[in-house]
């Protein structure tokens, strides 16, 4: 399996197909290259799918701390220029409070956890059930990856990396730990 979380398991094929469907939905809603996609989700397979879907449209996934209060959420989603936000259903009341303050957001996607769907939002499962997979597109190592800091000394700040730089850094870290991995991104492309 590619991902296991509780009782939910995704094969590599299912993971790729779900992400391709979510990516097509994002694209259909005007989210594309360099667009930011907020992930206000618990650790889950859906978090991984939404994260990968953002990459598939050459977008930038934005990590959102589920403990944030309304003012912190508004700050982070506005500061990051998020154009789509995936959120756990249990946070629908928080989303309802902040939604009008975030006019840049084109699509709100609610993951069903038993909470009624918030008006104006799209149900994650409906996106999966009703969207055809997006065809693969060529991405490059200069695409941006951004991680927001924890905000321990003030409000969180986005730290930007290129995909290539991030992967090369991870390869060097693994190599330093004694793991047999390719030397760099160029070696991966040749395998």
Question: Where are the language model's segments positioned?
Answer:
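Conserved short alpha-helical elements in the N-terminal third of ANL/AMP-binding
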Residues: 53-57, 172-178
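Conserved AMP-binding loop of ANL adenylate-forming enzymes
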Residues: 39, 165, 177-191
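Conserved AMP-binding A3 loop
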Residues: 11-13, 144-172, 180
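Structural core segment of the AMP-binding/adenylate-forming
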Residues: 28-29, 56-126
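Short hydrophobic alpha-helical segments of the AMP-binding
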Residues: 47-55, 61, 166
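Conserved pre-ATP/AMP-binding loop-to-beta segment of ANL
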Residues: 130-148, 154-155, 184-191
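Conserved AMP-binding/adenylate-forming core of the ANL superfamily
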Residues: 2-44, 48-52, 69-74, 125
């Amino acid at each position: 399996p590619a991902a296991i979380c509780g009782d939910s398991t995704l094969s590599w094929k299912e993971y790729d197909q779900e992400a391709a469907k979510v990516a097509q939905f994002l694209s259909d809603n005007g989210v594309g290259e360099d667009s930011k996609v907020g992930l206000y989700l618990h650790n889950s397979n859906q978090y991984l799918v939404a994260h990968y879907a953002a990459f598939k449209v050459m977008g930038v996934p934005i990590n959102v701390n589920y403990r944030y209060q309304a003012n912190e959420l508004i700050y982070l989603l506005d500061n990051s220029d998020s154009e789509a936000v995936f959120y756990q259903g249990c946070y629908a009341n928080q989303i309802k409070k902040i939604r009008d303050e975030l006019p840049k957001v084109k699509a709100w996607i609610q993951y069903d956890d038993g909470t009624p769907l918030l008006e104006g939002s799209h149900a994650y499962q409906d996106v999966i059930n009703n969207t055809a997979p997006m065809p693969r597109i060529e991405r490059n190592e200069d695409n941006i990856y951004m991680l927001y800091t924890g905000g321990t000394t003030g409000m969180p700040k986005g730290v930007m990396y290129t995909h290539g730089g991030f992967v090369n850094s991870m390869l060097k870290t693994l190599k330093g730990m004694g793991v047999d991995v390719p030397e760099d991104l160029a070696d991966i492309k040749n395998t």
